[in-house]
Design a protein with these regions (language model features):
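Aromatic- and glycine-rich beta-strand/loop motifs that create alpha-glucan
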Residues: 1-23, 160, 231-232
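Aromatic-anchored segments of alpha-helical transmembrane domains
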Residues: 26-33, 114-124, 170-181
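Hydrophobic alpha-helical transmembrane segments of polytopic membrane proteins
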Residues: 72, 136-163, 175, 214-222
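Membrane-interfacial helix-loop-helix connectors in multipass membrane proteins
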Residues: 120-139, 143
Length: 232
């Protein structure tokens, strides 16, 4: 499993997209924070929605991930499982390690990549601003764990990588919109999105934060079951 984890981690960092995402995150977060600092009214509204001691810079990174996280993860990892099956490289892995270790190893490799990516952005912004708020980091990683597990689940049930690429763009745009709208909406048809997507649970630091973790575990278990039953 460690081999799968390290390969997935290094492959993610080798991609030009990963470097662009780090630069994009840091640059947009800095611009957003600078804009809010220049507009005291907006800054007060932003900080009133944050916990005491929160950093405007790290908060900006978290907001960007909440909005674009699905799109980012799909862009890099939409074919994390089905590409291995299409190219038949999965056969080399299943001869050496159990299938569940392949799924978990890939999930952890992608998660570690995002942990390092977000940490790099946080370090750069902390050096600029002198502010750091670790609660933002851990909530962002928890959100990304949900997204990674969901993307891996989609890549497990859909055999064609080109289809997951198209679906990834569609879901990467639509799910954040539906999730964020459902948080403040009382309409009955938004309720499934409110409770199945992680946005509602990210509002505070209560026990609700465990629910995205539970969903992540469920997605991974289903992915493992699918892999075990699939003829490779």
């Amino acid at each position: 499993m460690v081999h799968v984890l390290m390969r997935e981690f290094t492959d993610s960092f080798k991609s030009v997209r990963s470097i662009l995402i780090i630069l994009f995150l840091t640059f947009i977060a800095y611009l957003s924070a600078s804009f809010l600092e220049d507009n005291p009214g907006l800054l007060d509204a932003f900080m009133s929605a944050q916990e005491d001691g929160a950093s405007i810079y790290t908060g900006a990174v978290s907001i960007i991930i909440l909005i674009l996280g699905f799109l980012f993860v799909f862009a890099i990892s939409h074919d994390v499982i089905n590409k291995e099956i299409e190219t038949r490289t999965i056969r080399l892995l299943v001869n050496k390690i159990p299938r569940w270790q392949i799924v978990i190893g890939k999930a952890l490799g992608i998660l570690f990549f995002w942990m390092i990516t977000i940490l790099i952005s946080y370090i750069i912004l902390t050096m600029i601003s002198g502010e750091l708020y670790l609660a933002h980091y851990f909530k962002t990683i928890l959100f990304l764990l949900y997204v990674i597990s969901f993307v891996l689940f989609i890549s497990s049930i859909i055999p064609k990588s080109k289809l997951t690429m198209f679906l990834g763009i569609l879901l990467g745009i639509s799910l954040p919109v539906l999730g964020l709208i459902s948080v403040s909406s009382e309409k009955w048809y938004f309720l499934p999105f409110k409770y199945l997507l992680p946005y509602y649970y990210m509002e505070d630091e209560s026990i609700k934060l465990l629910i995205p973790l539970i969903f992540s575990i469920i997605f991974l278990i289903i992915s493992v079951v699918i892999m075990k039953r699939r003829d490779l």
